């Protein structure tokens, strides 16, 4: 049976400042840790990215033409405060005013994120969110933006607190490139959640008219053998690292007994301890019912198997299928079942996982209010022919995920919109320019945009709300 979505559903496209803007040192922008880290460790940099800094009128005109009525944008913190605090860079402020004005002119509602992986270098080198001083700097930056940009109706504090801790301190593919430090992972999660809570409370206390939430990446975790209690435990522990710890902080205002028991077990196996303070929990408690919405980024699920050995993680950054490895001491290892398809980057394609995660949020955290799917899409080595890309695989991927959204809505979940990652091709943090996600193909040499087959398909779905 053909599935449909509600008439008021937002069909959006997602971007991020550092992945799209380029212009990394233009008009007074301060450095971020990624600038040097990419030069030192990867085969690409964030120049020119998609040159969104100059090309945003083109991208927003395409959005309007192709029925995209929402856009995720992030503000580059170091465009506003080049060192993270102190003097304001007025040219950066002016850029975002012009960008938001263009969004509204094109009837594309901006959903604006304050932090999308790009802490200013001065604060990053000072410990990033492991340093509690930077909680204060973030809250002050948020306060400035809330006051300066009243034209923004939808704010999110952070994009993917989980993958930030994961990328920086577990996998080590984000600066500062530390591996296997689980205590730092959890401390980063916690301190960022405290930062989120304080910013949300401030927003509500000031009585601003818009809405505010947070974007979490929530990959669903399953036991490889549901009948094997050790596999079930491995999936539970992996879920605590990536999902439950953060969701508890967001919606309970504390960490449940089960969550903390898992954290203690993981740290007993891997070393380290956490600094969790009473005032932190006061901040979390004060904000737990103030979130207007939850953004869920969902690309994949994982299957976990019990494992007795040392931690080893190999990141597949070049799309060499089968080259990744993930096993954590005292937790488990990822083993993909044969029946699930995978991308060249070993990401497991499993739309049912999105349904299961939405229903988990609905059932376990009933104060969630509403959900937007803030990222979902398929990374591909797109073939550019006839001035387009015949990306049937991407269409199929998005179609399947929209269908499970329709099912979740039918089953009582309040899902209000979907943002495809990404609106146009952007650069990928740890994969470069080869891994493309956009509805619009970007020739990174000329910065020309070309609609892919998926753009035409998405336009039709947005117009009719019928998924076919």
UniProtKB/Swiss-Prot annotation:
**Could you mention a single GO BP entry for this protein?**
lactose catabolic process via tagatose-6-phosphate
Enzyme Commission number(s) = 3.2.1.85
Q: Which GO terms describe its cellular component?
A: cytosol
Pfam families per record? Glyco_hydro_1 (PF00232)
| Record key words, sorted | Glycosidase, Hydrolase
Q: Which domain of life is it from?
A: Bacteria
Please state what class of enzyme this protein is: hydrolase
Q: Which residues form the active site?
A: 160 (proton donor), 375 (nucleophile)
Please give the family membership noted in the entry: Belongs to the glycosyl hydrolase 1 family.
Q: What is this protein called?
A: 6-phospho-beta-galactosidase
Q: In which organism is this protein found?
A: Streptococcus agalactiae serotype III (strain NEM316)
């Amino acid at each position: 049976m053909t599935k449909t979505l509600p008439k008021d559903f937002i069909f959006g496209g997602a971007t991020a400042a550092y992945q799209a803007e380029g212009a990394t040192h233009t008009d007074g922008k301060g450095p971020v840790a990624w600038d040097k880290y990419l030069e030192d460790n990867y085969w690409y940099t964030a120049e020119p990215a998609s040159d969104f800094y100059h090309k945003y009128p083109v991208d927003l005109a395409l959005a309007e033409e192709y029925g995209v009525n929402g856009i995720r944008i992030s503000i580059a913190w170091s465009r506003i405060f080049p060192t993270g605090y102190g003097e304001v860079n007025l040219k950066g402020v002016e850029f975002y005013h012009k960008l938001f004005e263009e969004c509204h002119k094109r009837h594309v509602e901006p959903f604006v994120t304050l932090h999308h992986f790009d802490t200013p270098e001065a604060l990053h080198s000072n410990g990033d969110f492991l340093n509690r001083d930077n909680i204060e700097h973030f809250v002050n930056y948020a306060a400035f933006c809330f006051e300066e940009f009243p034209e923004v109706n939808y704010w999110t504090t952070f994009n993917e607190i989980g993958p930030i801790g994961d990328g920086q301190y577990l996998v080590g593919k984000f600066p500062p490139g530390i591996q296997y430090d689980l205590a730092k992972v959890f401390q980063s999660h916690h301190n960022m959640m405290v930062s989120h809570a304080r910013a949300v409370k401030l927003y509500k206390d000031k009585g601003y008219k818009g809405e505010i939430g947070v974007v979490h990446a929530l990959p669903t975790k399953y036991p490889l053998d549901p009948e094997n209690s050790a596999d079930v435990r491995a999936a539970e522990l992996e879920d605590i690292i990536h999902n439950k710890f953060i969701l508890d902080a967001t919606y309970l205002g504390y960490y449940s007994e089960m969550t903390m028991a898992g954290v203690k077990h993981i740290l007993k196996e891997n070393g380290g301890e956490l600094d969790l303070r009473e005032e932190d929990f006061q901040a979390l408690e004060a904000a737990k019912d103030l979130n207007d919405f939850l953004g869920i980024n969902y690309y994949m699920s994982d299957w976990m198997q019990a494992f007795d050995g040392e931690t080893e993680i190999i990141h597949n950054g070049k799309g060499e299928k089968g080259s990744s490895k993930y096993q954590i001491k005292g937790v488990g290892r990822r083993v993909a079942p044969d029946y699930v398809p995978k991308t060249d980057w070993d990401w497991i394609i499993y739309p049912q996982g999105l349904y299961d995660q939405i229903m988990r949020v609905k059932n376990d955290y009933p104060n969630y209010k509403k959900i937007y799917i803030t990222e979902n899409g398929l990374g591909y080595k797109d073939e550019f022919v006839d001035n387009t890309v015949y990306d049937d695989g991407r269409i199929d991927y998005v179609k399947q995920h929209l269908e499970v959204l329709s099912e979740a809505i039918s089953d009582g979940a309040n899902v209000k919109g979907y943002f495809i990652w990404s609106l146009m091709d952007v650069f990928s943090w740890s994969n470069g320019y080869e891994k493309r996600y956009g509805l619009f193909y970007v020739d990174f040499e000329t910065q020309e945009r070309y609609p892919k087959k998926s753009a035409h398909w998405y336009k039709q779905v947005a117009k009719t709300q019928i998924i076919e």
